[in-house]
Swiss-Prot record:
HAMAP family: Ribosomal_bL20. Pfam families: Ribosomal_L20 (PF00453). The gene is rplT. Keywords: Ribonucleoprotein, Ribosomal protein, RNA-binding, rRNA-binding. SUPFAM superfamilies: Ribosomal protein L20. InterPro entries: Ribosomal_bL20, RIBOSOMAL_L20_CS, Ribosomal_protein_bL20_C. This is Large ribosomal subunit protein bL20. Binds directly to 23S ribosomal RNA and is necessary for the in vitro assembly process of the 50S ribosomal subunit. It is not involved in the protein synthesizing functions of that subunit. One of its GO terms (cellular component) is ribosome. GO terms for biological process: ribosomal large subunit assembly; translation.
């Protein structure tokens, strides 16, 4: 068997990791062993945070809807119950957007929710 020299593949592997670590501070950007650990940790954070992002945005939307619904005299839970009874299927993202940027439209939706709760 011929002798396999691995200089080319090792260099390519090192370059790939160091390219991923570009922009890091200190030795994390130019020492392969430390850069490899930093890139691995960054990947773990990215994986975790892609899932947390969904939760955090939902929390934000609910907080905004709750604040706007309370301004119109209805707490969040009763508002959402009223929407369900009125068969209004608008998701939280759109409701939060209306609550922030189109208050009159949101107020109309709250009135419909109130009417369906009273009926």
């Amino acid at each position: 068997m011929p002798r396999v020299k691995r200089g080319v593949t090792a260099r390519a592997r090192h370059k790939k990791i160091l390219a991923l670590a570009k922009g890091y501070r200190g030795r994390r950007k130019n020492v392969y062993r430390i850069a490899k650990q930093a890139v691995m940790k960054a990947g773990q954070y990215a994986y975790r945070d892609r899932r947390q992002k969904k939760r955090q945005f939902r929390q934000l939307w609910i907080a905004r809807i709750n604040a706007a619904a309370r301004e119109n005299g209805l707490p969040y839970s009763k508002f959402m119950n009223g929407l369900k009874k009125a068969a209004i299927e608008i998701d939280r993202k759109v409701l939060a957007d209306l609550a922030v940027f189109d208050k009159p439209a949101f107020a109309q939706i709250v009135e419909k929710a109130k009417a369906s709760l009273a009926a």
